């Protein structure tokens, strides 16, 4: 039974850091607590206005067991051999060459951390799942965060075991990749209830002394604020001019179709005396709901973060992620501050960036959530002390056969700090930044496999400090922003500085007087134009009754063959071309009653033999999915498009199998017909809802024209022959080809994305396609509008 004691307490500024300092002085936390456990310190702090996001603050007591991961040697995990530029679509695909290793370590009283055993896994989730046996039994009498769970740091560089891409710039051998404490002792401040609790797996001496100390401290708590940082020298990895040139380089890659959005970050660094003082200044001047402090003395490492962003929240099987994308600085005058907030809400660029991330996070949750459960739930403007942000809430229900480690594997690292499509941008980030990110854009948080409770932030607004044995630390701050085709290079340079400024001031006293401060608030995105009105309508549409869908199946060469479908059933072969929206299409089709078989279209596991693939799966329908780059990067998609136009994609009765290409798949069909593929003459358009003119075609049955659909593309097909007919164009110019069809065969392509939150009736296109087959006649199926909830 968990030992627990609780006291009433009010909510005051500086409460948690002051309490942690007091427990240090008593020898109950940190380097002076060696008789009770290790010297590692962890504080997960929620500050700012009390809300669902900012409620609990938790201080970990001295740990007895921890697990750590270090960068393998270059012999085990070599850097990728360059075969070209990711900015030109040449990505080193493939899994890691070494296992993801974690060391289980135990504290020897008053001494040091000793290694017990090393656990290996092929990816991050499988390695961490092997640690579940270390946890004590759960106390069924308690709810919420309990002692005995895992909590700590996952650096961005663990991406080596979460994404199928090989990197050129790896951390040095032995560098800390991850550290999770088994937290057997918690001090928890429940801000909404006004209580502070001490919880421990044992009613021991530490528990007694901690309770006694807190009782005495609460009589006259000392919460003095930290003095301002002294001004000191600061270095940047690049000049503003170089940063501006990188923005232009990314814009060219987007124009060429390699990706839609990329998050680039630059680094500032300098010597500092006390990372803990930096953290106290940060939480005082920039309170945020997902702040945190970590100290690991044997690695000479500290981390201070005031992150406002949530990667993953889990309660039982309910998952939530809250991507942030879209930023404006605060202003000193109220009028100018409100104008900047409205400017943010009215910006086509900022809205498009944000919608890309909403669709991306729906996709990532879709990898592990039950079909029909993923939805865009909320959209708002959050005003923090120095910036305004656009924030959404995307939710889903975890599948019964998966756990929180699987959910973390699917979402880590967050899409808002990589880009879209995710795998392609991770490769390009590695090329452009040319250095490992370490903790920045990784995650700090906790997970309890026993209760299914988890919360992981995204480590933005963070400072890392290393090498402080003599009090001389090297601190590092990284900040940047999402780059899209419409980005202005000078504005992007300034935005990176806004985001870094509060940290630079707290650490090095760089320019305190220049930072406007404002009150924190959360408000709905105002209805300023027809685009926002349409998105709000989509967000607030009530879901309809969903049929009972089958979960999608990921199939690889060598897996068991399928038996033929029964009369009237539909089996969809979906070719996944490494896009970050693929699972939205997969879920949409599964909701419509199709059995969806997912096959990789790029990379090591892509099937090269088309006829063997078709005979093994025996599909009734095929979708060639979207993806980064050009169709030439996707050989399987090219082959299927070519054979479909020849009438050689047929079922066992020699009837043609209906085939639909979406975005890149649409372009592959156009190229197979001999049409030209070239950059759009009107420029790249990503994350923007645009009106489309539809012709009278079965693919658009029961749909009005014009119709708003979401565009994500830089390239466009240009007709050069009559093998295909144009069935959709953009309403603005009526010249850009947005839909094609073969006049005699069941082959279609659409350039836009029907599965997006910005395509309110796009599901009807998927439905119309799936009811097109000799073996699948019948009434159309009603389904929920994809990814939305009222």
Regions found by a protein language model. Name each.
Residues 358, 575-576, 752:
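Active-site flanking residues adjacent to catalytic metal/cofactor-binding acidic residues
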Residues 564-571:
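A short, charged/proline- and glycine-enriched loop
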Residues 534-560, 755-790:
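Acyltransferase
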Residues 639-662, 667-764, 768-772:
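Pocket-forming structural segment of enzyme catalytic cores
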Residues 74-76, 468-473, 652-655, 734, ...:
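Short, solvent-exposed loop/turn segments that connect beta-strands within catalytic domains
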Residues 571-575, 579-662, 667, 673, ...:
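Flexible gly/pro-rich beta->alpha loop and the following alpha-helix that scaffold active-site loops
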Residues 267-268, 468, 627, 745, ...:
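Flexible loop residues that form catalytic
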Residues 1-543, 549-550, 554-559:
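Extended alpha-helical targeting/anchoring segments
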């Amino acid at each position: 039974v968990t030992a627990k004691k609780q006291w009433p307490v009010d909510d005051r500024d500086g409460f948690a850091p002051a309490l942690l300092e007091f427990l240090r002085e008593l020898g109950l936390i940190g380097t002076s607590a060696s008789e009770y456990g290790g010297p590692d310190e962890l504080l997960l702090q929620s500050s700012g206005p009390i809300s669902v996001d900012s409620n609990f603050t938790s201080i970990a007591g001295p740990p007895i067991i921890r697990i750590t991961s270090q960068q393998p040697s270059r012999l085990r995990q070599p850097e990728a051999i360059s075969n070209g530029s990711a900015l030109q679509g040449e990505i080193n695909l493939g899994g890691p060459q070494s296992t993801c290793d974690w060391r289980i370590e135990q504290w020897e009283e008053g001494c040091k951390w000793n290694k017990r055993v090393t656990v290996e896994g092929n990816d991050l989730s499988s390695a961490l799942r092997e640690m579940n046996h270390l946890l004590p039994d759960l106390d069924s009498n308690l709810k919420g965060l309990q002692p005995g769970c895992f909590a700590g740091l996952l650096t961005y560089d663990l991406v080596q075991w979460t994404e199928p891409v090989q990197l050129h710039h790896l951390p040095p051998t032995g560098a800390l990749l991850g550290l999770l404490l088994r937290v057997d002792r918690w001090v928890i401040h429940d801000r909404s209830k006004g209580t502070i609790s001490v919880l421990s797996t044992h009613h021991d001496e530490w528990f007694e002394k901690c309770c006694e100390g807190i009782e005495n401290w609460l009589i006259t708590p000392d919460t003095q604020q930290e003095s301002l940082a002294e001004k000191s020298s600061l270095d940047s990895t690049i000049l503003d001019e170089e940063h501006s040139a990188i923005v232009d380089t990314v814009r060219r890659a987007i124009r060429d179709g390699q990706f839609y959005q990329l998050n680039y970050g630059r680094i500032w660094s300098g010597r500092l005396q006390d990372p803990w003082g930096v953290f106290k200044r940060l939480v005082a001047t920039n309170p945020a709901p997902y702040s945190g402090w970590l100290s690991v003395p044997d690695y000479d490492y500290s981390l201070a973060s005031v992150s406002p962003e949530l990667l993953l929240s889990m309660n039982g099987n309910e998952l939530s992620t809250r991507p942030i994308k879209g930023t404006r600085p605060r202003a000193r005058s109220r009028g100018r501050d409100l104008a900047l907030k409205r400017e943010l809400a009215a910006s086509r660029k900022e809205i498009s960036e944000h919608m890309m991330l909403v669709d991306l996070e729906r996709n990532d949750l879709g990898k592990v959530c039950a079909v029909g459960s993923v939805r865009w739930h909320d959209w708002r403007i959050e005003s923090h002390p120095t910036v305004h942000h656009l924030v959404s809430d995307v939710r889903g229900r975890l599948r019964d056969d998966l756990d929180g480690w699987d959910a973390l594997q699917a979402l880590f690292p967050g899409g808002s700090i990589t880009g879209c499509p995710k795998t392609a941008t991770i490769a390009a980030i590695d090329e452009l930044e040319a250095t490992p990110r370490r903790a920045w854009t990784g995650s700090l948080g906790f997970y309890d496999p026993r209760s299914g409770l988890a919360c992981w932030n995204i480590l933005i607004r963070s400072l890392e400090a290393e090498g402080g044995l003599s009090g001389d630390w090297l601190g590092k701050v990284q900040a940047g922003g999402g780059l899209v085709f419409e980005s202005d290079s000078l504005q992007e340079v300034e935005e990176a500085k806004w985001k870094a400024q509060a940290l630079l001031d707290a650490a090095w006293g760089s320019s305190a007087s220049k930072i406007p401060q404002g009150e924190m608030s959360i408000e709905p995105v105002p209805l300023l134009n027809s685009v926002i009105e349409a998105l709000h309508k989509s967000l607030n549409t009530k879901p309809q009754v969903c049929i009972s869908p089958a979960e999608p199946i990921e199939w690889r060469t060598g897996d068991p063959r399928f038996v033929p479908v029964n009369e009237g059933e539909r089996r969809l072969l979906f070719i996944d071309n490494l896009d970050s929206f693929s699972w939205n299409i997969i879920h949409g089709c599964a909701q419509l009653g199709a059995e969806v078989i997912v096959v990789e279209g790029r990379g090591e596991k892509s099937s090269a033999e088309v006829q063997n693939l078709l005979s093994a799966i025996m599909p009734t329908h095929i979708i060639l999915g979207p993806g980064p780059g050009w169709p030439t990067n996707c050989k399987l998609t090219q082959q299927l498009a070519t054979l479909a136009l020849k009438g050689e994609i047929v079922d066992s009765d020699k009837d043609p199998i209906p085939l639909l290409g979406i975005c890149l798949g649409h372009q592959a069909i156009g190229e197979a017909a001999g049409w030209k593929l070239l950059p759009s003459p009107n420029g790249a358009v990503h994350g923007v809802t645009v009106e489309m003119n539809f012709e009278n075609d079965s693919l658009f049955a029961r749909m009005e024209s014009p119709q708003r659909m979401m565009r994500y593309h830089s390239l466009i097909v240009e007709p050069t022959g009559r093998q295909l007919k144009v069935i959709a164009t953009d309403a603005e110019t009526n010249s850009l080809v947005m839909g094609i069809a073969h006049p005699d065969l069941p082959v279609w392509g659409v350039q836009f994305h029907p599965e997006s939150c910005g395509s309110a009736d796009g599901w009807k296109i998927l439905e119309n396609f799936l009811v097109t087959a000799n073996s699948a006649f019948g009434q159309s199926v009603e389904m929920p509008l994809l990814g939305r909830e009222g």
